[in-house]
Amino acid sequence: NLTITKALLNVIADAKTKVYGDADPSLTYQVSGLKNGDTAGAVLNGGSLSRVAGENVGVYGINQGGLGLVSANYDLSYQGNNLTITKALLNVIADAKTKVYGDADPALTYQVSGLKNGDTAGAVLNG
């Protein structure tokens, strides 16, 4: 008797990075172990990877999500990776002020740009 066993299909998630407040990048992966001219599109179901929820700066795992096999000729080995959210650049620019010698100092003010996700200057700046 000849027994044909399943081949091991390796799926490795690509590491991803985004800046706080930006949209998630596409979660992609690499495939190895295909046999006999098979393609990833023919043996995988086309499902998407998912990631651990969260939008603050930090590291979030990339999971297998809905990605799976449609071919009975393979066993799937999935290796996750991480989505890293980095800090956004916040610009604070002091407004130009003038005063006449001897007068009281004017109120010092500034402009802020680069706020994201509905953040306000009062919520992210102190002092």
Language-model segments: what does each one mean?
Residues 1-127:
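Short loop/turn motifs that initiate or flank beta-strands
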